[in-house]
Amino acid sequence: MREAMTASSVLPTGLGPALRSLAAIALCSLMAACGSTAETAPPPVAAMPAQPQAAPPQPENVIGTGSVRIALILPLGASGNAATAARSLRNAAELALGEAGGADLQILVKDDGGTSQGAQAAAQQALDEGARAIVGPLFAHTVAAAGGVARQRNVPLVGFSTDTNVATRGVYLLSFLPETDVERVVRYAASQGKRSFAALVPDNAYGKVVEAAFRETVPATGGRIVGLERYATGSAAAYAEAAKRIAAGAQQADALFIPDAGDAVPQILAALQAAGVNPAGKQLMGTGLWDNPRLAANPALAGGIYAAPDPAGYRAFADRYAARFGSPPVRTASLAHDAVSLMAVIVRTQGPMGISDTAIQNPSGFSGVDGVFRFLADGTNQRGLAVMRIENGGIRVADPAPRSFTGAAL
């Protein structure tokens, strides 16, 4: 903690609150690596040149006037919700740069159209224009395409896909990974004395990911899986059949894990009761898909827990975003904000040439809108998540998110 306080004391005064939070954790790690003598003061951080009072108008595809260029690749020209999300992520990136206190960055905004070919071309163009890092794209196939180009040029990419199959060294995912949700909620349940677990999981790509994480985490906590069944999504008959198959095991369970969303969870609980399983006295568990006020209002979910970022950070970000752009952001807009803030911190603390795999993989991590996070060498991330509990028709924090990775149970 002493190191964190010292780091904070040497942060440049021009940093905005979000960037100061990111920089404090990054600086703490850098200072600790400089030597073992606590009394040795770190070298002063040079102040950034004063920004001009008035800047010339900029084109829509460029944000900022700094000397260090990074690319932001999004499906701005795609149709439907993809374009809406892309616009919101672009705005969030602009907000982050404005809050960065004169960061020496310039963002080159590129449209991939939501296609692999577009992402590959956008990445190539951005790197030819001098980008030293890529933020985005949004989808798994576009991250893979842009990441291939970035790796060939030894330029790091921080993307927003939740598909860990596209992550690798140099291609990092800042998204909310379902594996992290599962690990956090299972470990919390185990800390509350739960030892036997049953699960009903959707038979789809998401279900396969969370099932693998569940099978790995439960025994790691000293627990055992007494039943696990899959079901076809959207089918009441499939819910009923899966409930019958798992009924005997579920009766023995201390905790029931149902990683689904919307109307499916109450229907699955009803199917379990019809099969003779009484959920009373069993800990209901979900993932971030449960982070929905409509789901929380259902009495059948009372007492249920799931992992998610502490909502306070996002609410503050959403308020700042709405004040700046006149409408609320999409939920994933915080990812673009944190990715740009991350790049600004690295340039601020390590200089114009400082963006590298080593800097991005800082083991102390960074603190952003959605709490602390850090990247692993394989391109995936770890996040400090809160455990949320459904209570009285609402949602409250049952176990706060850790503020650092030192000694945190993640």
Predicted regions and their residues:
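Bacterial signal peptide processing site
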Residues: 35-38
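Segments of small-molecule ligand-sensing domains
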Residues: 325-397, 408-410
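Beta-alpha junction/loop-to-helix N-cap segments that form part of ligand/metal-binding clefts
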Residues: 87-88, 99-165
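Short beta-strand elements at the ligand-binding edges of bilobed clamshell
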Residues: 156-158, 165-187, 201, 228, ...
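C-terminal motif of bacterial Sec signal peptides marking the signal peptidase cleavage site
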Residues: 30-33
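Periplasmic-binding protein-like
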Residues: 126-138, 158-160, 196-201, 250-265, ...
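An alpha-beta-alpha
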Residues: 173-230
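Extracellular/periplasmic periplasmic-binding protein-like sensory domains
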Residues: 253, 265-337, 350-351, 401, ...
